[in-house]
UniProtKB/Swiss-Prot annotation:
Pfam annotation, one family: ATP-synt_ab
Gene transcribed to yield this protein: atpB
Gene Ontology cellular component terms for the protein in this record: chloroplast thylakoid membrane; mitochondrion; proton-transporting ATP synthase complex
Complexes and interactors: F-type ATPases have 2 components, CF(1) - the catalytic core - and CF(0) - the membrane proton channel. CF(1) has five subunits: alpha(3), beta(3), gamma(1), delta(1), epsilon(1). CF(0) has four main subunits: a(1), b(1), b'(1) and c(9-12).
Plastid keyword on record: yes
Residues annotated for ATP binding in this entry: 172-179
UniProt keywords, alphabetically: ATP synthesis, ATP-binding, CF(1), Chloroplast, Hydrogen ion transport, Ion transport, Membrane, Nucleotide-binding, Plastid, Thylakoid, Translocase, Transport
Protein name: ATP synthase subunit beta, chloroplastic
Similarity-based family: Belongs to the ATPase alpha/beta chains family.
Documented EC number(s): 7.1.2.2
Enzyme class: translocase
Classification via Gene3D superfamilies: 2.40.10.170, Bovine Mitochondrial F1-atpase, Atp Synthase Beta Chain, Chain D, domain 3, P-loop containing nucleotide triphosphate hydrolases
Highest taxon of the lineage: Eukaryota
Length: 495
């Protein structure tokens, strides 16, 4: 469904038209509000409570209607803390769903779930807003052609390619390079696709959000001197926020991304960190609303809620939203309903390995664990598919031989296996790559490697043409020509 942004100045109607109710009950982040007969607000309408608490502090709490209880009562979930609210306080029905600012003015800024800037850089310079609740695009509007989304990152493009308008799960523990990979993708989509990115921080640590913002400023993804030239908008609803805010912040980020896709007709990257927290917040809200819990205590509406978010992330004939979602797996149990429901929507998985990070191979993407539904000959072509399969076979054989090497040493292997190991070690190093956003830390200039160059490089390694080059020459280079040039430099240094 195409976006219809509004350009009104205020979400609250004029005084004469105000629909006023009063708080009847407060249960933590849940409010029951009584309205006059015949003036009930609709489900998902935004309600605003304005007033002063007992010590005279100004209160401004926005809530969202979740249930109509009968007897002129509605139950609403607050988007911020309900401290200081009392029974009998006046509640204004805005007559519409929560609306957030959209468009180019959002780039380089940090927002909360309500679309209010929280970066102390003043108000957002836009009057265009859009409601966070919307149905998914109609099937007739979808672009059903399967096409690869080129990232310029060798290991991703070759072994687990992303689908344009697809959904990718990003799995990785702390300190293996998730943030740097996310920033590189934001940088590359801006350079190669002329696209923008939206980052939705859903229920994660405030410190991580702050670190990401600082690193983005340091690497130039957010341009401090000219905010308008930034490549990303940030939307945060962190761990300390009420469940209502954490449940809706993903929709706020998605709404901003939809505007870039539908109105600006751009390719958009939408990052959600972490999709599990979206489910977790929904579970809390479900319990607060008194719904009967389902399997493992999750909400009975788990699949519906996940589907309503994921179905809006897609390619239309105007543009695309490609989503990269960090997935936390509780207790490493992949059968838990939250990750299991998420997997049903994913087109590709990018798994980051601590073992590779420890070896200093960055990006630390595990070439054997990462998967993609796009890696089929009819989609990527025979040449790409064959090269990817041969790379995986070589790495798999190397993995099988590692125990023998550890116990007996390389000399005990057959000639063929020794050759396989040598090529696998070159491939492993050639899968590393210097990043643009890491230039400030490493001093090495970043490299964007096109898909054709990537395939050519790995074909040359597999064919044995480069067997004579030292494996160090393949470490942290862009295309294969840089590896051969580096090998010549290493030879020169030895002499």
């Amino acid at each position: 469904m195409r976006i219809n942004p509004t350009t009104s100045d205020s979400t609250v109607s004029t005084l004469e038209e105000k629909n006023l109710g009063r708080i009847a009950q407060i249960i933590g982040p849940v409010l029951d509000v009584v309205f006059p007969p015949g003036k009930m607000p609709n489900i998902y309408n935004a309600l605003v409570v304005k007033g002063r608490d007992t010590v005279g502090q100004q209160i401004n709490v926005t809530c969202e209607v979740q249930q109509l209880l009968g007897n002129n009562r509605v139950r609403a979930v607050a988007m911020s803390a309900t401290d200081g609210l009392t029974r009998g306080m006046e509640v204004i029905d805005t007559g519409a769903a929560l609306s957030v600012p959209v468009g180019g003015a959002t780039l380089g800024r940090i927002f909360n779930v309500l679309g209010e800037p929280v970066d102390n850089l003043g108000p957002v310079d836009t009057r265009t807003t859009s409601p966070i609740h919307r149905s998914a695009p109609a099937f007739i509007q979808l672009d059903t052609k399967l096409s690869i989304f080129e990232t310029g990152i060798k290991v991703v493009d070759l072994l687990a390619p992303y689908r344009r308008g697809g959904k990718i799960g990003l799995f990785g523990g702390a300190g293996v390079g998730k943030t740097v990979l996310i920033m590189e993708l934001i940088n590359n989509i801006a350079k190669a696709h002329g696209g923008v990115s939206v980052f939705g921080g859903v229920g994660e640590r405030t410190r991580e959000g702050n670190d990401l913002y600082m690193e983005m400023k340091e690497s130039g993804v957010i341009n401090e001197k000219n905010i308008a030239e930034s490549k990303v908008a940030l939307v945060y609803g962190q761990m300390n926020e009420p469940p209502g805010a954490r449940m809706r912040v993903g929709l706020t980020a998605l709404t901003m991304a939809e505007y870039f896709r539908d109105v600006n007709e751009q390719d958009v990257l939408l990052f959600i960190d972490n999709i599990f927290r979206f489910v977790q917040a929904g579970s809390e809200v479900s319990a607060l609303l008194g719904r009967m819990p389902s399997a493992v205590g999750y909400q009975p509406t788990l699949s519906t809620e996940m589907g309503s978010l994921q179905e809006r992330i897609t390619s239309t004939k105007e543009g695309s939203i490609t989503s990269i979602q960090a997935v936390y797996v509780p207790a490493d149990d992949l059968t838990d309903p939250a990750p299991a429901t998420t997997f049903a929507h994913l087109d590709a998985t990018t798994v980051l390995s601590r073992g590779l990070a420890a070896k200093g191979i960055y990006p630390a993407v595990d070439p054997l664990d990462s998967t993609s539904t796009m890696l089929q000959p009819r989609i990527v072509g025979e040449e790409h598919y064959e090269t990817a399969q041969r790379v995986k076979q070589t790495l798999q054989r190397y993995k099988e031989l590692q125990d023998i090497i550890a116990i007996l040493g390389l000399d005990e292997l057959s000639e063929e296996d020794r050759l396989t190991v040598a090529r696998a070690r070159k491939i492993e190093r050639f899968l590393s790559q210097p990043f643009f956003v890491a230039e400030v830390f490493t001093g090495s200039p970043g490299k964007y490697v096109g898909l054709a160059e990537t395939i050519r490089g790995f074909q040359l390694i597999l064919s044995g043409e480069l067997d004579g080059l030292p494996e160090q020459a393949f470490y942290l280079v862009g295309n294969i020509d840089e590896a051969t040039a580096k090998a010549m430099n290493l030879e020169g240094e030895k002499k």
